[in-house]
Regions:
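A short N-terminal helical cap/helix-turn-helix that marks the beginning
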Residues: 2-22
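Conserved AMP-binding/adenylate-forming core of the ANL superfamily
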Residues: 22-56, 143-166
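Gly/Thr-rich phosphate-binding loop signature of adenosyl cofactor/nucleotide-binding cores
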Residues: 62
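Conserved AMP-binding
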Residues: 65-69, 176-180
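Cytochrome P450 catalytic-core helices
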Residues: 67-77
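Structural core segment of the AMP-binding/adenylate-forming
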Residues: 77, 81-144, 201-232
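Conserved short alpha-helical elements in the N-terminal third of ANL/AMP-binding
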Residues: 78-82, 183-197
Length: 232
């Protein structure tokens, strides 16, 4: 049975260097393009950090409180690679959060992501918060020994790819606020279909027509764009 980790591995074999996820933040001006190979490297480092340094275990529920972002995709794929279970509900286990809202009461560990361009560090991490950007680059580039989870999500991804009309080579524009609850649609279904994603946070609607042309967008999820095929 497929799992999210195997979907990423298939993307690496299919097109290792082409864009897998292109991220825009129109408030900060950031544009980050991540290939399948680069994504796999980030996922491996993050999985090693989570398992070896923060003691995340197979079947452990981990709260992922992150917005639409390329690093959100990395964290989710890393957790599935370990065999952990991403959840949107904070618990007494590890909590993964963005810079705002730190710390989280009752958490065993808090891993803080600044979500700044160039994997910037947290400006002033509170005591007890592990700064993702400060730790992840030192983690090993290869992850071994996990018991991948997310098989049900991967199975759903193949079905959703068909329902959304995604095909190999599609460039999917995502402009709505998305996160863990929508991960099958914006992350796993494109992986299953062999498509790639243009993920826009704080999208400036005036910039979308030019961006659609620049990124060769072929289909949109959420906000309609004139001249571009909607999903479904």
């Amino acid at each position: 049975m497929p799992d999210p980790a195997s979907l990423l591995a298939a993307a690496c074999r299919r097109d290792p260097a082409g864009p897998l996820l292109t991220f825009y933040d129109d408030e900060t001006g950031e544009r980050t393009e991540v290939s399948a190979t680069t994504a796999a490297n980030w996922v491996a480092k993050t999985a090693n950090l989570l398992r070896d340094d923060l003691d995340v275990e197979v079947d452990e529920a981990v709260a992922v409180l992150l917005p639409a972002h390329w690093q959100t995709a990395v964290v989710l794929l890393a957790l599935w690679s370990i065999g952990a279970v991403p959840t949107a509900t904070p618990a007494d286990g590890l909590v993964v959060v963005a810079g705002a809202g730190l710390p989280v009461a009752g958490a065993r560990e808090v891993l803080g992501l600044s979500l700044l361009p160039m994997n910037g560090r947290l400006p002033h991490p509170p005591a007890g918060v592990v700064d993702y950007a400060a730790e992840v680059l030192a983690a090993p580039d290869v992850f071994v020994g996990g018991e991948p989870s997310g098989q049900v999500d991967a199975e759903r991804a193949y079905r959703r790819a068909g329902e959304l009309g995604l095909a190999a080579g599609d460039r999917l524009l995502v402009t709505d606020a998305v996160g863990l609850a929508d991960a099958v649609d914006w992350l796993l279904a494109p992986l299953a279909a062999g498509a790639s994603v243009v993920l826009c946070r704080h999208a400036d609607l005036k910039r979308l027509p030019a961006r659609v042309a620049q990124e060769r967008v072929s289909v949109t999820l959420g906000r309609p764009v004139s001249g571009v095929r909607p999903t479904g």
